[in-house]
Regions:
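Short acidic/glycine- and proline-prone juxtamembrane loop motifs at membrane-interface regions
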Residues: 170-183
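Interfacial juxtamembrane loops and adjacent helix segments
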Residues: 45-133
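Membrane-interface junctions at the ends of membrane-embedded or membrane-associated helices
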Residues: 1-5, 150-152, 196-212
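Short helix- or helix-capping micro-motifs
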Residues: 16-17, 161-166, 193
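Transmembrane signal-anchor helices characteristic of membrane glycosylation enzymes that use polyprenol
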Residues: 6-37, 48-63, 86-90
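Specific aromatic-rich, kink-prone transmembrane helix
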Residues: 143-147, 183-203
Length: 212
């Protein structure tokens, strides 16, 4: 298979990864993933006050469980959703987000899969832009893993490695929810890809010196 065809397949893989995650972002019920409310709240607070929240003033141990995390994803999600209007808050931190719980959640096997009600892209758009931000980071992780595999084992192996990661149900699920796990995956994949680049470049340099 030619290099151009491998590159085209890699682009298709990344496009499918992003499409699957975005579909999950809008199909998944709001707050259906663990700690999504706390993660989303962190993003919204950053938009409300225009900076990182003052963690020393956190009034809830539950909120602090997420707010002590590194702000990489939360900052990226807040910037990605800048086009979404958010009412500013003079308090730092602002009061916790209140969402109406679904009293019939999981009460019947046929439905009631929404933990909360009256939450959708129209009235809570920042939640969905934050989910799409996670999807983008998921694509970045797949791209970095593909690059690492390609450098070591060739383009076909890189595609296989990227595909295995991209289409894991858990990975797609995380890519469609507000969480701080996707940036960790992306950073680890990028570091691994860069390490592979350094090792292979150094190996080629040593081989060239021996030939000389």
């Amino acid at each position: 298979m030619t290099i151009c065809r491998h590159r085209a397949l890699a682009v298709v893989l990344l496009a499918l990864t992003f499409a699957a995650a975005v579909h999950m972002a809008f199909a998944l019920p709001p707050l259906a993933t663990p700690n999504e409310l706390l993660n989303f709240e962190y993003v919204q607070v950053m938009r409300q006050i225009g900076s990182l929240p003052n963690r020393g003033l956190v009034d809830s141990e539950v909120r602090y469980t997420e707010w002590h995390q590194p702000p990489l994803y939360f900052t990226f999600a807040a910037l990605f959703g800048l086009s979404v209007p958010v009412e500013p808050s003079a308090a730092n931190p602002p009061p916790p987000i209140e969402m109406q719980a679904n009293p019939h959640y999981l009460s019947t096997p046929a439905g009631n899969r929404n933990p909360v009600v009256h939450v959708n892209p129209a009235n809570t758009p920042l939640l969905y832009t934050s989910r799409v931000a996670a999807a983008l980071l998921g694509v970045l992780g797949v791209a970095a893993l593909y690059a690492a595999g390609k450098r070591v084992l060739g383009p076909a192996a890189g595609l296989l490695m990227g595909s295995i990661l991209a289409f894991q149900p858990t990975y797609i699920h995380l890519g469609g929810s507000v969480n701080n796990d996707m940036p960790l995956t992306a950073v680890v994949a990028m570091v691994m890809s860069y390490a592979v680049l350094l090792v292979t470049s150094d190996g080629r340099r040593v081989a060239s010196e021996k030939e000389i």
